[in-house]
């Protein structure tokens, strides 16, 4: 779960990291009131969960209350990288003397945490790595032992960080690490971390929380912005389905994340593109299967659906019952592969169901199913 900038800054501030004064606005009148309170010179920041807001026109400076109001009128309701701007964070304009970068992220390759520091900032970390490789430092952190002082010194040296900022940057890195561990985050980032006459300030903030840890952080769960989620992904969340929308035309339904990803790989191998990732999990009932099918078919880009089930905890006959109910009036081509627990019973249900339905195809293997689905998608 990714938090908005204003939410992340509230958490950073709570833990002692300095941020500029600011408030959230949901209307032009809110912007007027906040701008007046902050003295007129403000920065208006669209609160949408995408990167590169500045380059896309989602961040604007205003040097008077009236200018802030006029720019807010332009921003509210505008579309920024596919997202409608409904909230603006109004922040006091600060004097920026230098921009830097500090962040921590999950390092899956090393099965730990990566601490990253750069003496330049204000751009994507990937861009920094290309343009200023000598000014970026990265170090692996073992969560068992934490972030040590000698590792921070190594980061400061290798990033060519001016010594006058060492003490403050070191303190911020330690705080970011505490935040990451406490909230079980996947990413904690300040970009840019700016130098001002009053010290270092987090001019932007990112905090991504591991969805699997949210049951231990009910206070953070309340911060989730469902209006920012894709409509279908939001529906999937509400129904407890693991769904990610993609840009292909072959709908995918599988039981288990590994099975779903393997199915998607096969679709790519045979020249197609999956329209989604959808894992119904283990032990899915007919009702869950029906909900999953309806979700896939609500995507207008889907030309064919490939259902790939290997029954373990999930029973093939239970899946077949759900498919029978969900697909009774569907004309979209459907390819089904059932194997595993109660496979014979499931196939009997499917064979009977497919008799008068030329759009329904039952296959023996994953490879056969993926190839068939891609071919059908090309023909539609």
From Swiss-Prot:
Residue ranges of the TM segments: none
UniProt KW keywords: ATP-binding, Ligase, Magnesium, Metal-binding, Nucleotide-binding, Tricarboxylic acid cycle
Top EC group: ligase
Pathway(s) of this molecule: Carbohydrate metabolism; tricarboxylic acid cycle; succinate from succinyl-CoA (ligase route): step 1/1
Catalytic activity from the UniProt record: succinate + ATP + CoA = succinyl-CoA + ADP + phosphate; GTP + succinate + CoA = succinyl-CoA + GDP + phosphate
Cofactor: Mg(2+)
A GO molecular function held by the record: succinate-CoA ligase (GDP-forming) activity
Domain ATP-grasp positions: 9-235
Residues that bind Mg(2+): 191, 204
Pfam families: ATP-grasp_2 (PF08442), Ligase_CoA (PF00549)
GO biological process, one term: succinyl-CoA metabolic process
Annotated ATP binding sites: 45, 52-54, 91, 94, 99
EC id: 6.2.1.5
Family: Belongs to the succinate/malate CoA ligase beta subunit family.
PANTHER family attached to this UniProt entry: SUCCINATE--COA LIGASE [GDP-FORMING] SUBUNIT BETA, MITOCHONDRIAL, SUCCINYL-COA SYNTHETASE BETA CHAIN
Assembly: Heterotetramer of two alpha and two beta subunits.
Designated name of the protein: Succinate--CoA ligase [ADP-forming] subunit beta 2
Organism annotation: Archaeoglobus fulgidus (strain ATCC 49558 / DSM 4304 / JCM 9628 / NBRC 100126 / VC-16)
């Amino acid at each position: 779960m990714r938090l908005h900038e204003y939410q992340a800054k509230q958490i950073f501030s709570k833990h002692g990291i300095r941020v500029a004064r600011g408030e959230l606005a949901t209307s032009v009148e809110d912007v007027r009131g906040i701008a007046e309170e902050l003295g007129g010179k403000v920065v208006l920041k669209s609160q949408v969960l995408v990167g590169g807001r500045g380059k896309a026109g989602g961040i604007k400076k205003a040097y008077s209350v009236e200018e802030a109001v006029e720019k807010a009128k332009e921003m509210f309701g505008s579309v920024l990288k596919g997202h409608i701007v409904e909230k603006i964070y109004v922040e006091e304009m600060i004097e920026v003397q230098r921009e830097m970068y500090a962040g921590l992220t999950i390092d899956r390759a090393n099965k730990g945490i990566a601490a990253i520091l750069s003496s330049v900032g204000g751009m994507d970390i990937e861009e920094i790595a290309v343009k200023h490789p000598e000014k970026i430092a990265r170090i692996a952190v073992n969560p068992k032992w934490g972030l040590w002082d000698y590792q921070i010194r190594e980061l400061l040296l290798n990033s060519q960080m001016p010594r006058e900022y060492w003490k403050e940057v070191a303190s911020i890195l330690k705080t970011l690490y505490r935040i990451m561990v406490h909230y079980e985050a996947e990413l904690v980032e300040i970009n840019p971390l700016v130098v001002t006459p009053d010290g270092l300030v987090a001019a932007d903030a990112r905090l991504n929380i591991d969805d699997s840890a949210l049951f231990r952080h009910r206070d953070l769960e309340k911060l989730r912005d469902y209006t920012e989620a894709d409509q279908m992904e939001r529906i999937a969340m509400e129904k407890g389905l693991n769904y990610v929308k993609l840009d292909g035309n072959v709908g995918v339904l599988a039981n288990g994340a590994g099975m779903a990803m393997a199915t998607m790989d096969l679709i790519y191998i045979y020249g197609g593109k999956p329209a989604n990732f959808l894992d119904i999990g283990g032990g899915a009932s007919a009702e869950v299967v029906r909900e999953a099918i309806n979700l896939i078919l609500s995507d207008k880009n889907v030309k064919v659906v490939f259902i790939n089930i290997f029954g373990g905890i999930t029973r093939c006959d239970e899946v077949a019952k759900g498919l029978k109910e969900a697909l009774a009036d569907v004309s979209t081509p459907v390819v089904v592969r059932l194997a595993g627990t109660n496979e014979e019973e499931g196939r009997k249900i499917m064979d009977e169901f497919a008799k008068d339905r030329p759009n329904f195809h039952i296959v023996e293997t994953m490879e056969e199913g993926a190839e068939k689905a891609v071919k059908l998608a090309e023909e539609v």
